[in-house]
């Protein structure tokens, strides 16, 4: 019996690790996450972007320029923004002081809209929807792409057996080969 739950990313990942959550439908694969999860897919490519005020469009073209901006940067707790971002976090200890860890996209985007943060790191698909709203589309733009990676279904190693994982992987490959995955993508 499965039941969909809307959970903050950080909490969902902790629950996957503990085995109290069996599956998360959208997760980037990393070595750390692979210790606790099986991955099936990928089902799409995710692009992580920096979104900020329109007047920053020609002032921020890379992560080093982003770091020179005054103010906070909002990120989603538990999200993966790529190896360059991870390296920056290790090399720039002061960066931690400038991060606002949001529990989800709504909180992050509310902080941006109220100008309590200078920029936000976000999935491009969410930003594209945000920018369709007249007021926000006039005020904010995508500043740069910071990472692109495949997104998978993640299954908890504590909640899903190796045998079930192999079966899921087999059926995923069958759906890919039959064209069913592509038909689902096109129907969205």
Model-identified regions with their sequence ranges:
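Periplasmic-binding protein-like
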Residues: 45-48, 135-172
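Flexible hinge/capping segments at coil-to-helix
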Residues: 54-73, 88
């Amino acid at each position: 019996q499965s039941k969909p739950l809307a959970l903050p990313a950080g909490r969902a990942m902790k629950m996957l690790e503990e085995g109290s959550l069996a599956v998360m439908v959208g997760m980037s694969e990393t070595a750390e996450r692979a210790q606790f999860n099986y991955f099936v897919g990928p089902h799409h490519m995710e692009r992580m972007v920096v979104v900020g005020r329109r007047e920053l469009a020609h002032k921020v073209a890379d992560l080093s320029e982003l770091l020179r901006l005054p103010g906070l940067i909002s990120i989603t707790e538990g999200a993966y923004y790529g190896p360059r971002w991870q390296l920056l976090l290790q090399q720039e200890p002061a960066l931690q002081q400038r991060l606002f860890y949001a529990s989800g996209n709504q909180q992050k985007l509310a902080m941006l809209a109220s100008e309590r943060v200078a920029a936000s790191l976000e999935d491009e698909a969410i930003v594209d929807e945000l920018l369709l709203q007249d007021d926000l589309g006039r005020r904010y733009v995508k500043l740069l792409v910071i990472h692109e990676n495949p997104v998978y279904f993640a299954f908890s190693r504590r909640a899903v057996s190796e045998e079930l994982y192999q079966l899921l992987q087999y059926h995923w490959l069958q759906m890919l080969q039959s064209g069913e995955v592509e038909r689902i993508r096109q129907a969205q």
